[in-house]
Design a protein with these regions (language model features):
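Hydrophobic alpha-helix feature that most strongly marks membrane-spanning transmembrane helices
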Residues: 121, 125, 151, 172-180
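Short secondary-structure subsegments characteristic of cysteine-rich extracellular domains
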Residues: 158-178
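Loop-rich catalytic cores of soluble enzymes, especially ATP-dependent carboxylate-amine ligases
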Residues: 1-137, 156
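Generic solvent-exposed, charged/amphipathic alpha-helical segments
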Residues: 5, 146, 168-172
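Conserved small/polar residues in nucleotide/adenosyl-binding loops
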Residues: 181-186
Length: 186
């Protein structure tokens, strides 16, 4: 995963297909994007706006000092587990339960592990009924989730064979050990 994270920018650059965004995503904030119509902003020559600041993300992760360590499976799961146990003052103000309803799962920075929004996430065997980090430690990485792939609008399946070949080669290339120092992401 670590080496793939270093190179996954190529996926959005080469295959990005989201140069436009619904105006509601910006919630009235000022933007340098151009107006396409009543409901849409766009950026000329953009590849993937959803992978930038406009896309869905948990801003508390970086602001609260959450750093996920990709240098080993053990460090990855340890840092992810720490993030879901780290309390958030902002979420404490909301509370968990009131008026007979749950407002959120807990008061922590990450409510659940799947709320960590990285472009590359190692995943355990889906048949495991435990938390993802426990599944990873139990059985290792079953597959890697690549969240930077946009649907290809020029094909009925959302991805074509050439894209799949490229991504497969990028993953294989990422398996080659590289002598970089540690990689920890916010």
């Amino acid at each position: 995963s670590r080496n793939l994270l270093r190179n996954d920018w190529m996926i959005a650059y080469l295959f990005g297909c989201s140069p436009a965004v619904c105006k509601s995503y910006l919630s009235g904030k000022k933007t340098q994007l151009e107006s396409f119509d009543q409901h849409t902003y766009y950026e000329k020559n953009a590849t993937s706006l959803r992978m930038g600041d406009i896309g869905y993300q948990n801003n508390l992760e970086e602001n609260m000092g959450v750093h996920i360590d990709y240098n080993s499976l053990e460090k990855y799961t340890e840092s992810l587990t720490k993030a879901i146990k780290e309390p958030s003052d902002e979420y404490k103000k909301i509370g968990v339960f009131s008026d007979g309803y749950y407002k959120q799962i807990n008061e922590n920075i990450l409510q659940i592990e799947n709320e960590y929004y990285s472009t590359v996430r190692p995943k355990p065997d889906p048949s495991y009924t435990c938390r993802p980090s426990k599944g990873l430690l139990k059985g290792g990485v079953n597959y890697i989730e690549l969240r930077s792939i946009d649907n290809n609008i020029y094909t009925n399946t959302g991805i074509d064979l050439e894209q799949m070949y490229f991504i497969e080669l990028l993953i294989i290339y990422s398996l080659i050990p590289v002598s970089y120092t540690h990689l920890t992401l916010p």
